[in-house]
A protein has these predicted regions:
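Glycine/Thr-rich beta-alpha phosphate-binding loop at enzyme active sites
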Residues: 93-95, 119-166
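Catalytic cores of alpha/beta
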Residues: 81-96, 123-134, 167-168, 173-174, ...
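Active-site mouth loops of central-metabolism enzymes
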Residues: 20-37, 117-121, 178-181
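N-terminal active-site wall of soluble small-molecule enzyme domains
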Residues: 50-114
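Structural preference for beta-strand elements that scaffold enzyme active sites
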Residues: 22-24, 49-52, 80-82, 96-99, ...
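Alpha-helix-loop-beta-strand connector modules within alpha/beta enzyme cores
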Residues: 64-82, 110-124, 154-177
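Glycine-rich phosphate-binding active-site loops on the catalytic face of alpha/beta enzymes
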Residues: 102-110, 140-152, 177-180, 185-205
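Acidic (Asp/Glu)-rich catalytic clusters
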Residues: 40-47, 75-76, 91, 110-113, ...
Length: 205
């Protein structure tokens, strides 16, 4: 299942969508230069493929309060929103899109039938296979390029990404050191990925 498929059909596209339609925005409120919800709305106005609300350091109650507001903003722009880690929050909000670290995905294996889209973060071809077996409908794979988020750690590179893409039949999204407008999105798609994920840049656009 593609992460960009919506129950009510195709999304409208405009000039912003033409640039961002293959980009998944990943949030990190600590990087914002403006109020967080204002930044989320700004991102949605660019019509990315989806948004992952990653603020997993929050308490469950704080995350739920934030998620309710973010889902309302995303809904106004028809931007798919993946909640992150908090499965029960997603259920209480009747939201069928969730993204989980691999260890949580495997813990919940067989217990996520009420979710339409289930993503997972992986860091090796073997983990990608495990994620698909555990029920993931897409994976994010990284880190592909040099990134400040992983200072001192060498990137896994495009050959890693190619191998991941050959090991699974679900969509793969590259993550790590990706910037819009640099040709990197096309580069990762040429490796077989369905697009790329961007955090830092999307928190500052």
């Amino acid at each position: 299942m593609s992460i960009c498929k919506e129950k009510n059909g195709a999304r409208n596209e405009n000039a912003g969508a033409a640039e961002y339609r293959n980009i998944i925005a990943v949030t990190n409120r600590k990087l914002c230069e403006r109020p967080f919800f204002e930044q989320v709305e700004r991102i949605c106005q660019m019509h990315p493929k989806a948004l992952i609300l990653r603020e997993k350091d929050l308490s469950e109650s704080a995350y739920e309060a934030m998620a309710g507001q973010v889902l309302e903003i995303c809904g106004r722009y028809d931007t798919p929103c993946m909640l992150h880690s908090f499965v029960e929050v997603a259920r209480r909000l009747h939201h069928p899109y969730i993204h989980l670290p691999l260890f949580l995905l495997e813990e919940y294996c067989g217990k996520l039938n009420d979710f339409r889209i289930v993503g997972s973060s992986i860091h090796s071809p073997e983990e990608a296979v495990r994620a698909q077996k555990a029920g993931a409908t897409y994976v994010t794979a990284g880190h592909v390029y040099v990134t400040d988020c992983k200072k001192g750690l060498p990137p896994r590179g495009l050959e890693f990404l190619k191998e991941v893409c050959t090991k699974v039949t679900i969509p793969v999204y590259a993550i790590g050191g990706i910037h819009a407008g640099t040709g990197q999105i096309q580069e990762v798609m040429d490796c077989g990925a369905s697009g790329g994920c961007i955090m830092s840049e999307m928190m500052k656009i």
